[in-house]
Curated annotation (Swiss-Prot):
UniProt cross-references to Gene3D superfamilies, sorted A to Z: 2.30.42.10, 2.40.240.130, Winged helix-like DNA-binding domain superfamily/Winged helix DNA-binding domain (1.10.10.10)
Domain notes: The DIX domain promotes homooligomerization.
Modified residues (Phosphoserine): 194
Subunit structure of this chain's protein: Interacts with CXXC4. Interacts (via PDZ domain) with NXN. Interacts with BRD7 and INVS. Interacts (via PDZ domain) with VANGL1 and VANGL2 (via C-terminus). Interacts with ARRB1; the interaction is enhanced by phosphorylation of DVL1. Interacts with CYLD. Interacts (via PDZ domain) with RYK. Self-associates (via DIX domain) and forms higher homooligomers. Interacts (via PDZ domain) with DACT1 and FZD7, where DACT1 and FZD7 compete for the same binding site.
Region described as Disordered: 89-237, 543-667
Segments forming domain PDZ: 251-323
Disease connection: Robinow syndrome, autosomal dominant 2: A rare skeletal dysplasia syndrome characterized by dysmorphic features resembling a fetal face, mesomelic limb shortening, hypoplastic external genitalia in males, costovertebral segmentation defects, and renal anomalies.
Protein name, as recorded: Segment polarity protein dishevelled homolog DVL-1
Domain DEP, first and last residues per copy: 425-499
Listed GO CC annotations: clathrin-coated vesicle; cytoplasmic vesicle; cytosol; dendritic spine; glutamatergic synapse; growth cone; lateral plasma membrane; microtubule
Gene designation: DVL1
Its biological purpose: Participates in Wnt signaling by binding to the cytoplasmic C-terminus of frizzled family members and transducing the Wnt signal to down-stream effectors. Plays a role both in canonical and non-canonical Wnt signaling. Plays a role in the signal transduction pathways mediated by multiple Wnt genes. Required for LEF1 activation upon WNT1 and WNT3A signaling. DVL1 and PAK1 form a ternary complex with MUSK which is important for MUSK-dependent regulation of AChR clustering during the formation of the neuromuscular junction (NMJ).
Protein localization: Cell membrane; Cytoplasm, Cytosol; Cytoplasmic vesicle
Post-translational modification, as annotated: Ubiquitinated; undergoes both 'Lys-48'-linked ubiquitination, leading to its subsequent degradation by the ubiquitin-proteasome pathway, and 'Lys-63'-linked ubiquitination. The interaction with INVS is required for ubiquitination. Deubiquitinated by CYLD, which acts on 'Lys-63'-linked ubiquitin chains.
Protein species of origin: Homo sapiens (Human)
């Protein structure tokens, strides 16, 4: 049984549909086709079919008679279904499409963009009155209808600033709906499409309705392809592309007498609208463009000398460029700078962020230098001696610290400072992603560029060979790093900057400190194997008090009795002020001397340090704090316990210092305090183990 294949394009969908009718091709009618589409609101569509005209060739013919036979080609029928709201035609007219210059693939895959017949005119009465009374249609069809209405209103309202037409539809349409295309009144006037179009075309002298229709539908099709991208308005489609979002136009004049060749390769862009411009593909070393350094890959070439490339095809642009290069004299190149100088591929710069990102550190440094908001480095107040002694070295050694005052770089400058300046965006050193053996090396530099930069920007190099040695030193010290960790420097290799945080290991906390008040004054401790001198003069020379102590204090004394701080009362407490626990006022010293024969006595009368006076009670002179200085020692070992040190056997009974109170033996300690004896004996065994000074 014979059958007919009907391929039809539905509204804005790019993929066509295929149905088969059990009817011979020469007998199939529009009614047969509509019966197959019973699940669709066919009365809301207009039907166009591929047909052959004797004068114009292949056209799209509208058929509205259900009994009319459908045109067939090679045993199949090609049709386009167009929403009635988006099309107006003269009843019974058989149109001819004027844009036959477009290739057939675009005609087939462009959806309804190319489906307007030449008789399309907004002022002609519509032949579909009453077609919008359908209220129970599917939600998909309603969505399409609303989308078409919105698109029509936008186009009619924005066509070259002309007011929207006052023609209203009688039924089913909102009162602000209007016709959608250019009318005959707009002949001989230029127009610009809506702002949503990313690449705006320039057209003038639209004298034929068919031409106007073709251009508008062409814009509509282009908008559908770019629906997800909100573009910017521009003056010409040939110069507005992704690579020129920054709108930074640069004119470079090159002196060809110094260089033998221009040194660029160009890339052309083409699309269905024609050629889209000439772009810089790559830059060759040794050429005039590479020596200038302002033109980068991805820049769009707008003009060479006095020849404008905007409205020129790619072939003509290449021909003109070759002719200009073959001539003598300087060459002026006008380019539109690419937003990203190192794109992974051409024309992939995102439109969402057309601004080059700033460097926050450089911005902060610049703002602080102008406003004076930050103090000078090295003079800011610090809260501790450690911070004071290391603040200047931290400032000079931390690579990330911004310098408010830029000094000229010399061979004697810190390497980290040279590398920091080298990494600045405007340093002049080309830092970008490189390809090596199909591996992308991010933010890499060429060794030759590093040597040239050092020789140019660092003072003190008499010849380039010295700059090369300096670059080798940068590699040796880790400021530069080879891709495969080679230690020999080569000008032909790619290098990346080393991890700057590793330089923190070279910090010196003592550098930059001055004065004794900023330094720790710990006294030397005796060797653990040496005898611990009890009751004898101390052979160690202890330094005097720092000048920051008040005049009421004298040289740190060493109490042999109960002169330690209130931290003695707790068994497990630890004194953080060990070197100060044995200091006493001159008045207390006299009282001790006066009470030398009267035993230990009570110390509750004396003035105690702040916060601990209430806890001072009468206590034996032999009791010592665990946290007090090891220089404050007690009497002999208690009976029944092993001696703490072999050399302490000779010191069984020890008297206090001259004029001081006598020292009781450890065995005479009251029972309630015997719990601390064991820890005391351990501390006496090896005092260096238990003596910890807290800075």
């Amino acid at each position: 049984m014979a059958e007919t294949k009907i391929i039809y394009h539905m509204d804005e969908e790019e993929t066509p549909y295929l149905v088969k009718l059990p009817v011979a091709p020469e007998r199939v009618t529009l009614a047969d086709f509509k019966n197959v589409l019973s699940n669709r609101p066919v009365h809301a569509y207009k039907f166009f079919f591929k047909s052959m005209d004797q004068d114009f060739g292949v056209v799209k013919e509208e058929i509205f008679d259900d009994n009319a036979k459908l045109p067939c080609f090679n045993g199949r029928v090609v049709s386009w279904l167009v929403l009635a709201e988006g099309a107006h035609s003269d009843a019974g007219s058989q149109g001819t499409d004027s844009h036959t210059d477009l290739p057939p693939p675009l005609e087939r895959t462009g959806g309804i963009g190319d489906s307007r017949p030449p008789s399309f005119h907004p002022n002609v009465a519509s032949s579909r009155d009453g077609m919008d009374n359908e209220t129970g249609t599917e939600s998909m069809v309603s969505h399409r209808r609303e989308r078409a209405r919105r698109r029509n209103r936008e186009e009619a309202a924005r066509t070259n600033g002309h007011p929207r037409g006052d023609r209203r539809r009688d039924v089913g349409l909102p009162p602000d709906s209007a016709s959608t295309a250019l009318s005959s009144e707009l002949e001989s006037s230029s127009f610009v499409d809506s702002d949503e179009d990313g690449s705006t075309s320039r057209l003038s002298s639209s004298t034929e309705q068919s031409t106007s229709s073709r251009l508008i539908r062409k814009h509509k099709r282009r908008r559908r392809k770019q629906r997800l991208r909100q573009a910017d308005r521009a003056s010409s489609f040939s110069s507005i592309t992704d690579s020129t979002m920054s709108l930074n136009i640069v004119t470079v004049t090159l002196n060809m007498e110094r260089h033998h060749f221009l040194g660029i390769s160009i890339v052309g862009q083409s699309n269905d609208r024609g050629d889209g411009g000439i772009y810089i593909g790559s830059i060759m070393k040794g050429g005039a463009v590479a020596a200038d350094g302002r033109i980068e890959p991805g820049d769009m070439l707008l003009q060479v000398n006095d020849v404008n490339f905007e409205n020129m095809s790619n072939d003509d642009a290449v021909r003109v460029l070759r002719e200009i290069v073959s001539q003598t004299g300087p060459i002026s190149l006008t380019v539109a700078k690419c937003w990203d100088p190192t794109p992974r591929s051409y024309f992939t710069v995102p439109r969402a962020d057309p601004v080059r990102p700033i460097d926050p550190a450089a911005w902060l440094s610049h703002t602080a230098a102008l406003t004076g908001a930050l103090p000078r480095y090295g003079t800011s107040p610090c809260s501790s001696a450690v911070t004071r002694t290391s603040s200047s070295s931290l400032t000079s050694s931390v690579p990330g610290a911004p310098q408010l005052e830029e000094a000229p770089l010399t061979v004697k400058s810190d390497m980290s400072a040279v590398v920091r300046v080298m990494q600045l965006p405007d340093s002049g050193l080309e830092i970008r992603d490189r390809m090596w053996l199909k591996i992308t090396i991010a933010n890499a530099v060429i060794g030759a560029d590093v040597v040239d930069w050092l020789y140019t920007h660092v003072e003190g190099f008499k010849e380039r060979r010295e700059a090369r040695k300096y670059a080798s030193s940068l590699l040796k010290h880790g400021f530069l790093r080879h891709t495969v960790n080679k230690i020999t420097f080569s000008e032909q290799c790619y290098y990346v900057f080393g991890d700057l945080c590793s330089n923190l290991a070279t910090l010196n906390l003592n550098s930059g400190s001055s004065g004794t008040s900023d330094q720790d004054t710990l006294a030397p401790l005796p060797h653990p194997a040496a005898p611990w001198p009890l009751g004898q003069g101390y052979p160690y020379q202890y330094p005097g008090p720092p000048p920051c102590f008040p005049p009421a204090y004298q040289d740190p004394g060493f109490s042999y009795g109960s002169g330690s701080t209130g931290s003695q009362q707790s068994e497990g407490s630890k004194s953080s002020g060990s070197t100060r626990s044995s200091r006493r006022a001159p008045g207390r010293e006299k009282e001790r001397r006066a009470a030398g024969a009267g035993g230990s006595g009570s110390e509750s009368d004396h003035t105690a340090p702040s916060g601990v006076g209430s806890s001072w009670r009468e206590r034996p002179a032999g009791q010592l704090s665990r946290g007090s200085s090891p220089r404050s020692q007690a009497s002999a070992t208690a009976p029944g316990l092993p001696p703490p040190h072999p050399t302490t056997k000779a010191y069984t009974v020890v008297g206090g210092p001259p004029g001081g109170p006598p020292v009781r033996e450890l065995a005479a300690v009251p029972p309630e305090l015997t719990g601390s004896r064991q820890s005391f004996q351990k501390a006496m065994g090896n005092p260096c183990e238990f003596f910890v000074d807290i800075m």
